[in-house]
Amino acid sequence: RFGCSQPRGEEKTTTEGVGSEQRCERSPDAIVPESAVVSADPVPDDRILENALATVYEYTDKDLGDAVDGTNRQILRRRLLYLACMAPVPNDVPQVRLRHDRVSYGDLCHYGWNVWNAFKGATNRFYDQTELAEWLKASFESLAKYNTKTLRAKLRATDGGYRIRLIDNLKEYIQK
């Protein structure tokens, strides 16, 4: 589900005009250029989910900003879009590669929990924590070696010194 689907034949799965400065109406984030949004990408189905996605993007920039370069930031935003819309991530979306192991696997689990919590609050239906752990494993190259049960157990762990803390309200957190 989180990186194992094949696009349908009629779907466009490549980006054209990379480097275009135009903005895309389909992107809930005005910063993402049209070239980064593929026509087959899902679209949030309501304003509440769009707002949650924008909040998650800001949170990602705040807490993971120094750990991802521009390319990996776009990859992560695309993966977050699929997560928010509860859509399978196409195989052509690569995993996110972090810089120099600046973020521990426990921190990524906390990051995932915070993102999940924001999306869960924006919709009546959302993935369970095991599915979130699967998404984390499929999304981050550094988590591929861990099993899903281990990642799920770390989602709300408080047993160590984590740089990324658990946050109940992302909107309030990013405004600080």
Could you say what each language-model-derived stretch is?
Residues 8-176:
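Flexible coil/loop and intrinsically disordered linker positions at secondary-structure junctions
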